[in-house]
Amino acid sequence: MLSGERKEGGSPRFGKLHLPVGLWINSPRKQLAKLGRRWPSAASVKSSSSDTGSRSSEPLPPPPPHVELRRVGAVKAAGGASGSRAKRISQLFRGSGTGTTGSSGAGGPGTPGGAQRWASEKKLPELAAGVAPEPPLATRATAPPGVLKIFGAGLASGANYKSVLATARSTARELVAEALERYGLAGSPGGGPGESSCVDAFALCDALGRPAAAGVGSGEWRAEHLRVLGDSERPLLVQELWRARPGWARRFELRGREEARRLEQEAFGAADSEGTGAPSWRPQKNRSRAASGGAALASPGPGTGSGAPAGSGGKERSENLSLRRSVSELSLQGRRRRQQERRQQALSMAPGAADAQIGTADPGDFDQLTQCLIQAPSNRPYFLLLQGYQDAQDFVVYVMTREQHVFGRGGNSSGRGGSPAPYVDTFLNAPDILPRHCTVRAGPEHPAMVRPSRGAPVTHNGCLLLREAELHPGDLLGLGEHFLFMYKDPRTGGSGPARPPWLPARPGATPPGPGWAFSCRLCGRGLQERGEALAAYLDGREPVLRFRPREEEALLGEIVRAAAAGSGDLPPLGPATLLALCVQHSARELELGHLPRLLGRLARLIKEAVWEKIKEIGDRQPENHPEGVPEVPLTPEAVSVELRPLMLWMANTTELLSFVQEKVLEMEKEADQEDPQLCNDLELCDEAMALLDEVIMCTFQQSVYYLTKTLYSTLPALLDSNPFTAGAELPGPGAELGAMPPGLRPTLGVFQAALELTSQCELHPDLVSQTFGYLFFFSNASLLNSLMERGQGRPFYQWSRAVQIRTNLDLVLDWLQGAGLGDIATEFFRKLSMAVNLLCVPRTSLLKASWSSLRTDHPTLTPAQLHHLLSHYQLGPGRGPPAAWDPPPAEREAVDTGDIFESFSSHPPLILPLGSSRLRLTGPVTDDALHRELRRLRRLLWDLEQQELPANYRHGPPVATSP
């Protein structure tokens, strides 16, 4: 694995490539990783076999960074030199023009004196023929001092080995110096001016090879791999780290540093020619887990000696490559070979392939050709790159590994306040790509959805994308100014559209005539067809109102102005419907941050219009009249006319608020939770909805204020009027207002006017109930306070008067029951009914009752109110209340300090309606008045757009031709 492809959290490479398995295997980086493997050094991986490594139990010194394994090609051995150890150095070397050779201990032709050789040298043929497996590592706890055989293959042709005593602390530099001394080169003129320079000119190499095949020559050594040991490495420990496979031999060789450098440069040059530069794989030697065979190096150049036949070079190289690979890599090599064969077969079947003269192809060319054969995934959606920013870094296929895929800019940038950078699946390193640029959701259900981030330039099939939209297979997705992708989903099984929507509608030959010149090149529609579509929109009944952000203020102002003026015959909820169309267009078509700004502007316009209307009503109905000018009470008809605009605004604002709440919730769900502007948008929406709440509160308060002000002058008749007048017949339940007793008609007239007003304005049922609840609360408190006040100082609490009040109250409740308000009226008139029922008890029964029984029968009355009614009850001349009516000592304090009057401030709070809005923006507009207003607004927007054009480009709205 490359150092840049770690699975660590700080690097997104491996986890963010989004390539299928086949693509990753065939990528150049994968082969680069294979070429970059090294032999282990003294501080690297310790292996007990050629395929399995285990970490050494002892801490070892780290190797120098230049320690590498190089392939030197086939090194041919020419035979060993004969003679005793005491002979001169000139007798140990013999010139041979056969290239770089080394002896493994067997005497060659023409080398007499083999009987005088050391015993260790006599055993060398057996060692070279096949190295016996070393004892297991478990039996060698600590490396004792030993003798290392250092061959002088790099000194001269035919140089034999020298035995050098080494310990676990002996370094490669020390052993080189000792070996040179044994060879008689230390301090020689050829070696340099001194011993130090002579040692610096040579390096100790760890060589891996095997005897030649049968028939080539018994005991001939052929080096396959070579690694230069660092000066600080311990050769004895290196020897203990691993052993060669059966059939392979390992030995230490003494070579010149210049030769080692040349081999290194040749290896790097071969790697660069295959597209695998050395800087990419050099760091791998310290952390990769290599096989015992090491890394294959470049073959020797034509000028170097080769001990292998030319025809067997490819086979031997393939065997060498297989030696250092695991089973899985060998399987992948077979897969590559099969892919190359299929590619060659495809090329041979191409037209003209039979005539083409194809020479010997470089295997690297076939590898690169195989890498170009990309097979897309079959079970995951992916994006096909059509245009990128940097061809050297961009991939061709980006696979969706999650249901939600995020495109964004790479890097280690953090968010605001030091927060970590947002999670991104695919990094696009273009300057105009945002940290979170675009999000695609492709779940099990189709279609997929694409949502741009705030301020991110995204196009969908060539059109600017501002909101979430559907993404179908074959659609083009543009990110910024550089990236263009095609979305593909193999899971659909070809169920997508037959033709992509971005293709021209007329793919045939260009039709002659002027019609083609006046048509759109992209969609193929002619100018006349486009004009008809525009005319159909301007006059259509679809609930759609399109506008540009620059026209927003004029459009909203026109809708609010028309609603405030009450001009036209719009339906009651027409203004809310038109404003909701504006909100819907902003939520669906315009940018993410536009909706909060529109809601704020809309709420302020409505508030200003309502404030102006309240001020106008206040000027006509002042609270403080000038002295000498009598106050004229409001009639039910007059109050209905005055309150109609306020009631309309209350109804429209209530429905609009419910609609806005739904859209804000949708916006919060759709919005990217990583968007730093999301909180700011939600705050702006909350402020706008708070203004709408305030408008509803004020309109409700003003409406009930003027209604209760009218009721205040009509309610006393319920206590004073006698329903049993001569010739009067009591009406039954559900009677008309004209059939009611005259004393009840003004009060019932106010209730009826309020009921008709709420119905005409289509006020929400919850607000209708709360409006009448407040009216009944006020009526109950006002009548009860008047009843308590009437009993002080005059005989009012009598059975006959109580019967009249009870009858009037029953008639009012029956009429309200017929109007559908019986339950609300019964609940709020309960205390007044309880007080009147107490006064309606016959005198004889009342005298027999005690305080405790009366408290039990009339629980809604407070002790002070009950004591007030009993203490002022008229029992007759000179008769006072009996002692049984006196409260006990435990309630005496409550009677003395309690208030007998009801408080008007304890009214129930206003609760705004919950649930979905009653505005229906689906289906054609059926109301003719609303359709006319919608057409007027569309043409107004058309005129505003035409005013921005030069005079010679302006024209009137198109008119649809009749069929």
Curated annotation (Swiss-Prot):
PROSITE patterns: DILUTE, RA. One of its GO terms (molecular function) is protein homodimerization activity. Residues 600-897 form the Dilute domain. Residues 144-259 form the Ras-associating domain. Residues 1-22, 35-118, 267-356 are annotated as: Disordered. Coiled coil: none annotated. Disulfide bonds: none annotated. Keywords: Angiogenesis, Cytoplasm, Golgi apparatus, Methylation, Phosphoprotein. Highly expressed in heart. Detected at lower levels in placenta and pancreas. Residues 1-10 have a biased composition (Basic and acidic residues). The modification Omega-N-methylarginine is found at R94. Residues 41-57, 290-301, 320-333 have a biased composition (Low complexity). The modification Phosphoserine is found at S188, S280, S292, S326, S328, S331, S419. Signal peptide: none annotated. Residues 96-113, 302-313 have a biased composition (Gly residues). GO terms for cellular component: cell-cell junction; Golgi stack; perinuclear region of cytoplasm; protein-containing complex. It is found in: Cytoplasm, Perinuclear region; Golgi apparatus, Golgi stack. GO terms for biological process: angiogenesis; branching morphogenesis of an epithelial tube; negative regulation of autophagy; negative regulation of membrane permeability; negative regulation of Rho protein signal transduction; negative regulation of Rho-dependent protein serine/threonine kinase activity; positive regulation of integrin activation; regulation of GTPase activity. Interacts with Ras family members that have been activated by GTP binding. Interacts with HRAS, RAP1A, RAP2, RRAS, RAF1 and RRAS2. Interacts with MYH9 and ARHGAP29. Required for the proper formation of vascular structures that develop via both vasculogenesis and angiogenesis. Acts as a critical and vascular-specific regulator of GTPase signaling, cell architecture, and adhesion, which is essential for endothelial cell morphogenesis and blood vessel tubulogenesis. Regulates the activity of Rho GTPases in part by recruiting ARHGAP29 and suppressing RhoA signaling and dampening ROCK and MYH9 activities in endothelial cells. May act as effector for Golgi-bound HRAS and other Ras-like proteins. May promote HRAS-mediated transformation. This is Ras-interacting protein 1.
